[in-house]
Curated annotation (Swiss-Prot):
It comes from Nitrosococcus oceani (strain ATCC 19707 / BCRC 17464 / JCM 30415 / NCIMB 11848 / C-107). ATP binds at residue 239. HAMAP family: Glu_tRNA_synth_type1 (MF_00022). Signal peptide: none annotated. A motif ('HIGH' region) lies at residues 9-19. Monomer. GO terms for cellular component: cytosol. This is Glutamate--tRNA ligase 1.
Length: 469
């Protein structure tokens, strides 16, 4: 048997971290077992679905590297198939037409609640054989009245539902459009899904869907219901906790592999290991090892993990992702120093690629103004002489590499009887516009001789102007 898993989001909003974790678990399970991973877009809610959301899902999957083997398949292209199955269920007496009006259903619900009963459809149309004039019917599934449904869940173990507690769910609305519980069964059946990994908010749908499978003469797939992700307040993760689109994490400067690593550890672990390559995830992950209890999303832990990935990844890999962020700032990284070298100079301290992009910008374009506090502190008349001397030494430099530049700075400091910081910091502000940069000799090598001289000239002119103002 070839393992077949799927990710089936609804394009009614952004792709959030809970959905990504579900997709990741399904993808890892398929990859671990040499199976197939299918992407299905459940877009039957035409009012709320949008192509913008579809594109956001596809973009997110691509950025994360969760490549799918088949799809994307769209449910709106399969309405004729759903109608065919509805007719089959009606013909086999596993479904029936229900003519109850909304008012009648509301009255039924109110009476049941008054009797402190669980609200549910009472089946009054199960054996109705004549249409009701002026009423468009829905199609309901004729749920078994006896027996039980046993779900052998890979995460939760054996879960048992009594059929007499399940009501007759709607399969098709009055306008003929199919409902979720029908479409998901037909799709999983037609697409040969062997394993369905999804959030545990779907657990109560599982016995209903299983009964539809049985009515169609098919065995349901193996299910695994993973617990939800909670915010720090132990409430379900939402926008107020930062549960934004996965692409917002890209915009904030997170690496895709850092986000995947963080999400795989929400509910799953392998000893005390914190950091996993994608290859290690595929090798070690097992859906049966996922915890049953909910996990808490910790933004600080994600940030720490992102920092570790930035620090320890190949500079060329970081540069590939950093180039996108520089592009967002209107910077073409091909017009300047080697981007991998710029990355290497900053990897040790950068927490996000967004931070690194802003810190890298002065290497590729002139900064608009000096950081005011730093300029007032470091660019003053007392450094005019040392800076002019340093500029002349730089102008005559025969080798523009960090060790040689370091020696030039030391020689200048000694000749003016200064401590290194008294010249290095003004130089840093002059070159970068701010008091923070990689080591000053490395910064100068990356900046290049011509740009370094031009920026020292700019700083000298700025100091002169302030001194004479």
């Amino acid at each position: 048997m070839t393992v077949r898993t799927r990710f089936a989001p609804s394009p009614t909003g952004y792709l959030h971290v809970g959905g990504v974790r579900t997709a990741l678990f399904s993808w890892l399970y398929a990859r671990k077992h040499g199976g197939r991973f299918i992407l299905r877009i459940e877009d039957t809610d035409r009012e709320r679905s949008s192509m913008e959301s579809v594109n956001a899902i596809l973009e997110g999957m691509t950025w994360l590297g969760l490549e799918y083997d088949e799809g994307p398949f769209y449910q709106t292209n399969r309405f004729s198939r759903y109608r065919e199955i509805i007719e089959q269920l009606l013909a086999s007496n596993h479904a029936y037409l229900c003519y109850c009006t909304r008012e009648e259903l509301a009255s039924m619900r109110a009476e049941q609640m008054a009797r402190k009963e669980k609200p549910r459809y009472d089946g009054r149309c199960r054996e109705r054989h004549s249409p009701r004039e002026g009423v468009s019917p829905v199609v309901r599934f004729k749920s078994p009245l006896e027996g039980r449904v046993v779900i052998r869940d890979l995460v939760r173990g054996m879960v048992i539902f009594q059929n007499n507690e399940l009501d007759d769910l709607v399969l098709a609305r009055t306008d003929g459009t199919p409902t979720y519980n029908l479409t998901v069964v037909v799709d999983d059946m037609d697409m040969g899904m062997t394993h369905v990994i999804r959030g545990d908010d779907h657990l109560n749908n599982t016995p209903r869907q299983s009964n539809i499978f049985y009515a169609l003469g098919k065995e349901p797939p193996v299910y695994a219901h993973v617990p939800m992700i909670l915010g720090p307040d132990r409430q379900r993760l939402s926008k107020r906790h930062g549960a934004v689109s996965v692409m917002n994490y890209r915009e904030a400067g997170y690496l895709p592999e850092a986000l995947l690593n963080y999400l795989v550890r929400l509910g799953w672990s392998h000893g005390d290991q914190e950091i996993f390559s994608v290859a290690e995830m595929i090798k070690l992950f097992d859906i049966e090892d996922v915890n049953q209890s909910a996990s808490t999303f910790n933004s600080e832990k994600l940030l720490w993990l992102n920092q570790q990935y930035i620090k320890n990844s190949a500079p060329e890999h970081i540069a590939h992702h950093l180039s996108w962020h520089l592009g967002q700032l209107g910077i073409d990284p091909s017009k300047g120093p080697d981007l991998a070298a710029v990355v290497k100079a900053q990897q040790e301290r950068s927490k996000t690629l967004l931070e690194m992009a802003h810190n890298s910008a002065p290497f590729y374009r002139e900064f608009e103004a000096y950081e005011e506090t730093a300029a007032r502190k470091h660019l003053n008349a007392s450094v005019l002489g040392p800076l002019r001397d340093l500029r002349e030494r730089f102008k005559e430099a025969q080798s523009w590499v960090a060790p040689a530049l370091h020696e030039i700075i030391l020689a200048t400091v000694e000749s003016h009887h200064l401590k290194l910081g008294k010249l290095a910091q003004p130089l840093r502000v002059a070159i970068m516009g701010r008091p923070i940069s990689p080591p000053i000799d490395v910064t100068l090598e990356l900046m290049g001789q011509a740009t370094t001289l031009a920026r020292i000239d700019r700083a000298l002119a700025w100091i002169d102007h302030r001194s004479n103002a």
